[in-house]
Amino acid sequence: MRKNRAEKRKVLPDPVYNSVLVTRAINAIMLDGKKGIAQKILYGSFDLIAQKTQKDPLEIFNKAVENIMPRLELKVRRIAGANYQVPTDVSPERKVTLALRWLVTLSRKRHEKTMLDKIANEIIDASNNTGASVKKREDTHKMAEANKAFAHMRM
């Protein structure tokens, strides 16, 4: 175990949109440290969003992330040999992390041809409160609601 808790690293805002959220999305998309490719993918999908919707892509992206963010999540707690899924509140930092993770992983599962199209369409869907990532949030909330009886078991 660590002596002290590791301090959070500051994420710098991206150069194009000057947004920390966009940088975090780029980092979520990035595979094997290839940040340049991840930037091309996200900025390209922002261009596609601008073409398709005729609106500011950053606004649509922020709305999409807000629609994906979960309020509750389930944590497994073992008590007397039984595992219980305990609903807990999600911290603001983790809300964003989960939203971006779900956005990227569920974008990768889509059936469009390129990653640009996949992410662009998932962001547009999420901003309209549809799509796989919003469904993931809804499923998480349903599970938390179903396990509300275990909420007294604090984490």
UniProtKB/Swiss-Prot annotation:
GO terms for molecular function: rRNA binding; structural constituent of ribosome; tRNA binding. CDD domains: uS7_Bacteria. One of its GO terms (cellular component) is small ribosomal subunit. GO terms for biological process: translation. Keywords: Ribonucleoprotein, Ribosomal protein, RNA-binding, rRNA-binding, tRNA-binding. Signal peptide: none annotated. InterPro entries: Ribosomal_uS7 (IPR000235), Ribosomal_uS7_bac/org-type (IPR005717), Ribosomal_uS7_CS (IPR020606), Ribosomal_uS7_dom (IPR023798), Ribosomal_uS7_dom_sf (IPR036823). The keyword Repeat does not apply. PANTHER family: RIBOSOMAL PROTEIN S7 (PTHR11205). Part of the 30S ribosomal subunit. Contacts proteins S9 and S11. One of the primary rRNA binding proteins, it binds directly to 16S rRNA where it nucleates assembly of the head domain of the 30S subunit. Is located at the subunit interface close to the decoding center, probably blocks exit of the E-site tRNA. Belongs to the universal ribosomal protein uS7 family. This is Small ribosomal subunit protein uS7. It comes from Mycoplasmoides gallisepticum (strain R(low / passage 15 / clone 2)). The gene is rpsG.
